């Protein structure tokens, strides 16, 4: 059984993160994940997130989005939770 605390760890849960733009926010997500998950490369995570976003926005409005993608190098689900200083639409 996969447990939530292995998918979303305290090290991948950040608040008051500077965002500025969608691209910068995705870069930050990719950096946080790659820093915490050694088998994943930041650039690969970032490129996959951007490619997924090009298929259609993962934003819900009101500053909420759930960017996601599939990563070949990941053997288990991985997530990060970032609360930005200011919402991005």
Swiss-Prot record:
Keyword Protein transport annotated: no
Where it sits in the cell: the answer is: Cytoplasm
What keyword terms does UniProt attach to this protein? Cytoplasm, Kinase, Transferase
Gene3D superfamilies this protein is in?
Answer: Mannitol-specific EII, Chain A (3.40.930.10)
Q: Where is the PTS EIIA type-2 domain?
A: 6-89
Catalytic residues, chain numbering: 68 (tele-phosphohistidine intermediate)
The GO molecular function terms of this record are: kinase activity; protein kinase activator activity
Q: Which GO terms describe its cellular component?
A: cytoplasm
Against PANTHER family, the record matches this protein to: NITROGEN REGULATORY PROTEIN (PTHR47738:SF1), PTS SYSTEM FRUCTOSE-LIKE EIIA COMPONENT-RELATED (PTHR47738)
| Function, in words | Seems to have a role in regulating nitrogen assimilation.
What domain comment accompanies this record?
Answer: The PTS EIIA type-2 domain may serve a regulatory function, through its phosphorylation activity.
Record's protein name: Nitrogen regulatory protein
């Amino acid at each position: 059984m996969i447990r939530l605390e292995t998918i979303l760890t305290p090290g991948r849960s950040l608040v008051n993160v500077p965002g500025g733009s969608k691209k910068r926010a995705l870069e930050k997500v990719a950096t946080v994940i790659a820093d915490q998950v050694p088998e994943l490369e930041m650039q690969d995570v970032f490129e996959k997130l951007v490619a997924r976003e090009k298929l259609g926005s993962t934003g819900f409005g009101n500053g909420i989005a759930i960017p996601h993608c599939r990563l070949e190098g990941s053997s288990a689900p991985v997530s990060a939770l970032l609360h930005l200083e200011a919402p991005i639409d």
